[in-house]
């Protein structure tokens, strides 16, 4: 699928508009073979689904059928055998993970699984402190584990680049099992690790799903460990709830069938009563919907879990899921909520500062944006990744933000756009970096403050070679053009079959041209409500945080929209509603 030229090139927000061109022959073939509605099939074609079997599978994910065999991960048999041996011989096992949602859910999945197999008194969990230890497995953690008598270390969401730590563990007689999903570096996976479970690199060459989150890799290990357990299916189904949270929060590809099945099944489980006091308390405090959706995970549950590692210590998350009583769980969930409120405040302060800089430089922005400052200046390490995402959304440019500490070291996060592979970009400046790692669209790095300007210049030189000017800036691409009479409650419910939405499977975006504009109202001086249509076909269209565009709409008789379809449920009555992403006056 490719974007087509449009008369409207930009909306009033400044975003560039595109309309996807659909293969009409493939569309008609699918329509005949599946009997599905055209608008649904257009969306599926836009997500790369052009065969009937794939379409049917996508629309009806099956948890057990869509999970790949864990033994397709090359080192799975060795990992399983070693962990079973450790439990049999009463050897201590240390689980070390990242401090984000993917890492903390992985920790809970692995610890619960190993405890079910008889390792209750053998398992310890360790999460590095973001501010004093930084990201990843370190030599200090390995040495400490050796001194405390651990004979096995299992990592999750970290470790794929820990070559030195793998060598150290081997030297100290510790067997290191790595569960990760990040890209290995040029050396491939750590050769001296006892086992590496990763869908990327040589260890995952036969694994079909290259977009598995670390919690997904942890679930695969649980699958294999529990292969002979009489309650395996029920346990794996329960663990899928945490896997769904980690998968959505880590923003992996939800068009991938295995991820889709995990999230769909996990969300169903989350919508049912839980026997875990911590999960119950977290869901209650997060005020999630019924049923729970990826939006609830991404914007309510996930941020509260993430907040602990961003502003304090992620151990609070592990304590929550280990809580034995509702009273204890409620206190711990409230603590996460307070952490999240603090995170929101420091994030707001930093974003306001960065938005001002962007606005001042809007006519001369670099291809790649790099911001740096001290914590006293508002550059708090815990919110850099979120701030990057917001600036990318605002500018449509790869963005890196780093916080400089008192020793002159800058720790940073990066987020990207299509066409700019972050790891390859960081590879191009690796000689000025202390360390780095991540994915094509998200990465982390450490650099000496004195090297930041050199890094900025070289990243932009690299960007000039791989990014055209036309690829920069915010772009909105519609799945299809829609008329007002098709934007019904029934159509919206039909499109809900595309859920769960996320990376790789975004909520459908539609172009609606030259709609009669009846009125524009301000809501709480922040948002806009547009009344659109004629006579009996009036429909409400809401545009959040768009009050600044009210003057541009004043006096207009017609408006074109980039929008999403929604249902407004009130007093047992359902009405259609539009969520505006951008608008244009032709």
Predicted segments, located by residue:
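OB-fold and OB-like beta-barrel modules that bind single-stranded nucleic acids
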Residues: 437, 495, 514, 556-567
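Beta-strand/loop nucleic-acid-binding surfaces
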Residues: 536-552
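Accessory interdomain/linker segments of ATP-dependent helicases and helicase-like nucleic-acid enzymes
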Residues: 476-539
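A common structural junction motif
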Residues: 430-435, 461-468
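Active-site cavity-forming subdomains of large catalytic enzyme subunits
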Residues: 140-215, 219-228, 234, 238
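Hydrophobic helix-and-loop "lid/oligomerization" segment in the mid-to-C-terminal part
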Residues: 12, 20-24, 30-151, 172-173, ...
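N-terminal amphipathic/basic leader segments beginning at the initiator methionine
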Residues: 2-21
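OB-fold single-stranded nucleic acid-binding module
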Residues: 451-456, 524, 549-550, 557-586
């Amino acid at each position: 699928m490719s974007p087509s030229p449009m008369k409207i090139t930009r909306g009033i927000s400044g975003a560039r508009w595109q309309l996807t061109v659909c293969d009409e022959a493939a569309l008609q073939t699918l329509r005949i073979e599946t009997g599905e509605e055209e608008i649904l099939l257009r969306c599926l074609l836009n997500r790369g689904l052009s065969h009937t079997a794939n379409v049917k599978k996508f629309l009806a994910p099956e948890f057990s059928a869509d999970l790949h065999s864990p033994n397709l991960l090359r080192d799975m048999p060795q990992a399983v055998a070693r962990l079973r041996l450790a439990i049999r011989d009463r050897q201590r096992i240390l689980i070390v993970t990242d401090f984000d949602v993917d890492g903390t859910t992985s920790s809970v999945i692995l610890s619960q699984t190993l405890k079910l197999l008889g390792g209750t008194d053998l398992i310890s969990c360790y999460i590095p402190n973001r501010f004093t230890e930084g990201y990843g497995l370190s030599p200090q953690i390995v040495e400490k584990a050796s001194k405390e008598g651990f004979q096995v270390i299992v990592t999750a969401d970290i470790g794929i680049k820990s070559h030195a730590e793998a060598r150290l563990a081997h030297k100290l007689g510790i067997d290191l099992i790595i569960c990760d999903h990040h890209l290995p570096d040029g050396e491939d996976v750590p050769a001296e690790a006892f086992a590496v479970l990763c869908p990327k690199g040589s260890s995952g060459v036969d694994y079909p799903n290259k977009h598995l989150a670390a919690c997904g890799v942890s679930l695969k290990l649980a699958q294999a460990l529990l292969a002979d357990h009489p309650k395996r299916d029920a346990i794996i189904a329960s663990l899928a709830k945490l896997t769904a949270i980690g998968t959505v929060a880590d923003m992996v590809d939800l068009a991938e069938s295995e991820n889709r099945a995990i999230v769909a099944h996990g969300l169903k489980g989350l919508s049912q009563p839980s026997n875990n006091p911590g999960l119950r308390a977290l869901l209650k405090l997060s005020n999630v919907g019924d049923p729970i959706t990826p939006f609830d995970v991404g914007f309510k549950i996930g941020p509260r879990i993430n907040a602990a590692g961003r502003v304090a210590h992620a151990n609070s998350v592990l304590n929550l899921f280990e809580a034995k009583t509702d009273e204890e769980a409620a206190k711990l969930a409230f603590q996460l909520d307070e952490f999240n409120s603090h995170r929101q405040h420091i994030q707001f302060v930093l974003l306001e500062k960065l938005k001002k800089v962007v606005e001042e430089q809007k006519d001369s922005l670099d291809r790649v944006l790099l911001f740096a400052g001290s914590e006293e200046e508002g550059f708090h390490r815990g919110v850099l990744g979120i701030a990057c995402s917001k600036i990318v959304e605002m500018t449509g440019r790869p963005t890196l933000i780093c916080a400089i500490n008192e020793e002159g070291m800058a720790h940073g996060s990066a987020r990207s756009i299509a066409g700019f592979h972050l790891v390859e970009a960081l590879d191009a400046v690796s000689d000025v970096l202390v360390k780095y790692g991540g994915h094509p669209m998200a990465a982390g790095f450490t650099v000496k403050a004195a090297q930041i300007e050199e890094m900025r210049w070289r990243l932009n030189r690299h960007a000039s070679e791989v990014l055209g000017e036309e690829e920069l800036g915010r772009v909105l691409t519609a799945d299809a053009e829609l008329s007002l009479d098709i934007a019904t409650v029934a159509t919206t419910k039909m499109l809900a079959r595309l859920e769960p939405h996320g990376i790789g499977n975004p909520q459908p975006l539609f172009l609606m041209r030259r709609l009669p504009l009846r009125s524009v109202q301000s809501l709480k001086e922040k948002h806009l409500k547009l009344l659109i249509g004629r006579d009996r076909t009036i429909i409400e269209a809401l545009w959040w945080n768009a009050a600044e565009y009210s003057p541009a709409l004043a006096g207009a008789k017609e408006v074109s929209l980039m929008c999403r379809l929604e249902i407004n449920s009130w007093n047992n009555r359902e009405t259609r509603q539009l969520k505006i992403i951008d608008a244009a006056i032709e």
